[in-house]
Design a protein with these regions (language model features):
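Short histidine-centered beta-strand/loop micro-motifs
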Residues: 48-51, 113, 135-138, 217-222, ...
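Short, structured beta-strand/loop micro-motifs enriched in basic residues and often containing a Trp
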Residues: 99-108, 234-243, 357-365
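Hydrophobic, well-ordered secondary-structure segments
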Residues: 346-351, 355-363, 372-373, 401-408
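Glycine-rich active-site loops that engage anionic ligands at enzyme catalytic sites
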Residues: 205-241, 333-340, 344, 348
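Short, glycine/small-residue-enriched coil/turn segments at secondary-structure junctions
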Residues: 57-63, 114-120, 197-207, 290-291, ...
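Hot-dog-fold acyl-thioester-processing enzymes
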Residues: 2-106, 176-177, 181-197, 280-360
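Short, solvent-exposed loop/turn elements at beta->coil junctions and helix N-caps
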Residues: 214, 365-371
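HotDog/MaoC-like acyl-thioester-processing domains
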Residues: 1-22, 104-190, 237-299, 372-419
Length: 419
């Protein structure tokens, strides 16, 4: 380590443990903000938006989604900048070595109690750690841990979040796979180009009757193995097509499927088979209904420019890399990409849809890898990995994995309290 390197490291070390005065949310939590979050995520949990149902439930009234904890104190699009905040000081030191791009890559949440409309939160942040320089798929950079305790303005603790961010040098990013705009969708094989084709409508449901993994090469721009399958559709039609957006371990004969339409670069529409969105439970599971190794049905989620922007704004995250393609490219990304609060929100919805509307998320951990870019599909799947007795019920641990064409996007784990 050179003298300048040692000085650089010493400047970073001097900031570890630095704390800030509390940052107060601009507004108290409102039902309107919760409803906008639900609209962006596609979450229909009545605990978040049905006052009559919520009043008669274990919640006793509307509650906010658990993973929204750290969004309420975000500064929004017009930051009232407080000079010399600890994170700003770390970023200033890192910027002297070219580490100017940022991405949130990991969070750990612990929840003390549910958040409710009217709660006005304060964030008490401190710098937990700054890593040595690392090589990542985004480029070379440093991981910075921001530890935040959250309390109401009356001083009541409601939770803690450890947020890990990567500050990387965009000039060090190596060339990777092509963007979704350069991705050619595979046609169904074989193709009778001259024959007229009546496509089944998108959304047509059915049952997979057979599937296989062909011997020829998969799409080199998609990390997922290539599968084809045959299904019996709801109207009795037999239909064969690519099985899309699903890893082979998630595909089995007899599973429900739905027809989706995939558009190629030249404007063709190709029908594919994929998994439907899992049905949301209207009653809450009990611990007796759950076993270790139990799998959650997969949920393929289209990633679009609209969904990325909607999730970012609904979670008060106006970082330009989620909203402005030019800014994202300038900072070394291939396009705008989904924010960590958005990815966490989708996982939160996936878990509570499976567990039921009175299930309580006790803690939540998530790590991001490959970014979610427009034109891709991110498929969530999960498995129960732990069961522990708790007061009045069972604490269930569920591990969730979200994959897209670039590989793993999100690896998450949550503890859920069931009756």
């Amino acid at each position: 380590m050179t003298g300048s390197d040692a000085d650089f490291r010493a400047r970073l070390d001097a900031l570890i443990g630095l704390t800030d005065p509390p940052r107060r949310a601009k507004d108290a939590i409102t039902e309107a903000a919760i409803r906008i979050w639900c609209d962006a995520v596609g979450d229909e949990n009545p605990a978040y938006q049905d006052p009559r149902w919520a009043a008669g439930s274990v919640w006793g009234g509307i509650v906010a989604p658990a993973t929204s904890l750290n969004m309420w104190t975000l500064p929004g699009n017009r930051r009232a900048h407080r000079h010399a905040e600890s994170l700003d000081r770390v970023n200033e030191v890192l910027a002297t070595r070219g580490f100017t791009s940022v991405a949130a890559v990991q969070t750990e949440h612990t929840y003390v109690r549910p958040l409710r409309p009217g709660d006005h939160l304060e964030q008490f942040p401190s710098i937990g750690a700054v890593s040595p320089e690392k090589s990542t798929r985004l480029g070379r950079g440093h991981f910075v841990d921001l530890v935040s305790d959250y309390r109401t303005v009356e001083g009541e603790p409601v939770g803690r979040v450890v947020l890990r961010m990567l500050r990387w040098n965009p000039a060090t990013r190596t060339e990777g796979p092509a963007t979704s705009g350069d991705r050619l969708a595979r046609p169904v094989r074989p193709v009778a180009a001259a024959a007229p084709i009546d496509l089944p409508p998108a959304g047509t449901t059915g049952t997979l009757t057979a599937h296989l993994q062909p011997g020829y090469a998969a799409d080199p721009l998609d990390e997922r193995p290539y599968l084809v399958g045959s299904a019996e559709l709801a109207d009795g039609t037999r239909f064969s097509a690519d099985v899309a957006y699903l890893r082979p371990d998630l595909v089995h004969d007899g599973m429900p499927v739905v027809v989706a339409h995939r558009r190629t670069r030249d404007g063709q529409i190709l029908p594919v088979l994929t998994a439907p969105r899992p049905q949301r439970r209207t009653s809450t599971r009990t611990g007796a209904e759950v076993s270790i190794g139990q799998r959650l049905a997969p949920w393929p989620i289209p990633v679009t420019q609209l969904s990325i922007a909607a999730l970012a704004t609904a979670t008060f995250d106006f970082n330009d890399v989620h909203l402005d393609r030019d800014a994202a490219l300038e900072r070394g990304a291939r396009d705008v990409y989904m924010n960590i609060l958005g990815s966490s929100a989708l996982v939160n919805c996936y878990l509570t849809d499976w567990a039921g509307p009175e299930a309580r998320v006790v803690d939540f951990r998530t790590r991001l890898a490959a970014q979610n870019h427009p034109g891709d599909t991110c498929t969530l799947d999960g498995v129960v990995t732990g069961l522990n007795p708790a007061d009045g019920g069972t604490h269930v641990t569920v591990d969730v994995r979200g994959t897209n064409s670039l590989g793993d996007h999100v690896i998450a784990s949550a503890t859920i309290a069931l009756p």
